[in-house]
Regions:
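PAPS-dependent sulfotransferase catalytic core
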Residues: 1-50, 135, 139-144, 149-150
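A sequence-composition feature that detects small, non-aromatic residues
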Residues: 15-18, 39, 43, 47, ...
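Short coil/turn segments at beta-strand junctions that form active-site/ligand-binding loops
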Residues: 2, 47-48, 68-71, 106, ...
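PAPS-dependent sulfotransferase catalytic domain
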Residues: 55-134
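Low-complexity, intrinsically disordered/propeptide-like segments
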Residues: 23-24, 94, 166
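The conserved 3'-phosphoadenosine-5'-phosphosulfate
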Residues: 35-38, 102-168
Length: 168
């Protein structure tokens, strides 16, 4: 069963958070909804805590997501910053409705910028996972630009397919 979820728009630090929340006692899979359904992920069993960090969760109905028992961390990033980052990858912009949905999800709300300030991130991390905060590991990961190249490539290919269907 999924123990925790990280919800955010694309380019909002979900890959970085998946790395942070993968520890000796937990695993956080980034963008698993490209390959599996939520029901399939919930049926997975393993040792330790299991979490997902997936931008596609923002497409789900907020009420449905709120009914799921997993703890949720919701990451907010300015829509202009999200869209600027998406444009650099050749991907379409997100709409206002996607950002508003985040407000409807229950859980721990944090901004993208707060992820990179230890005094703001630490309470969120400790809330999501009941384990001691590793400040040395945080300092190391904080400086890394972590991106999921496979998810980016899949999104680009899906967008190209969509554009080609529009031309037919």
């Amino acid at each position: 069963v999924i123990d925790f979820m990280i919800v955010g728009l694309p380019r909002s630090g979900t890959a970085w958070l998946a790395n942070w929340f993968t520890t000796e006692r937990s695993i956080c899979w980034h963008e698993p909804l490209w390959q599996r359904s939520l029901a399939e992920l919930d049926a997975m069993k393993g040792a330790g805590l299991f979490g997902i960090a997936d931008t596609q969760l923002t497409l789900m109905n907020a009420d449905e997501l709120n009914r799921h028992p997993a703890k949720k961390m919701i990451v907010h990033r300015e829509l202009g910053d999200v869209n600027f980052s998406l444009a650099k990858l050749g991907l379409p912009a997100m709409q206002d409705e996607h950002k508003w949905k985040l407000d409807e999800i229950g859980g721990y709300h944090i901004t993208f910028h707060d992820l990179f300030h230890v005094e703001r991130f630490r309470p969120a991390a400790e809330w999501l996972l009941p384990m001691p905060f590793d400040a040395a590991r945080y300092s190391l990961l904080r400086g890394l630009n972590i991106q999921n190249a496979l998810a980016i490539k899949e999104a680009q290919e899906a967008y190209i397919d969509y554009l080609e269907m529009q031309d037919e």
